Amino acid sequence: MTEVTSSDFCIAIYREDDVWEAQALPVAVTESLDAVIGALRQLPSIGVVIGLIAVGDDFFVIARIVGSQVSLFVSDLTASVDWPLAREVLEHLDIDVPYDEDLDQVLPAGDLSILADLGIDEMELCALSGDLDLFPDEVLASLARRIGFGPAFDRAVDEATGQ
């Protein structure tokens, strides 16, 4: 089992009555992809549910649930060498875990258009994922602001991290 840190969180985003809602999920759900998907499916939204998961200072995952369909994005596939959640995302996507010699760069993987209908295109998502000056929580906060649920996201992160 990988150590959970204070910078780990899983925030569920969904719309209710045309208002973005954000809910902190127990950080324990980040221990497996099945737990993340199961927790997101329990939410009351009749539309899309988005999970924004930060794992330490290393990487983030975006999970999007629409009915029975699951779309996934991981900010750095090389995280799969050390982190079970990233490895499970790659397995779900049918992408091989990289070899050690492939670990010299940040490589996003998955559905690059996962947020395109919300105003974040593939190029922007890749650029933010590859920005080595930003931590995963900062990238997710930036995405939340751009999409329009920044304040709700910030409150949920504060709740999740005990701030």
Q: Which residues does each predicted region cover?
A:
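Conserved hydrophobic/aromatic positions in well-ordered beta-strands
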Residues: 12-13, 63
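Charged, compositionally biased boundary regions
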Residues: 81-163
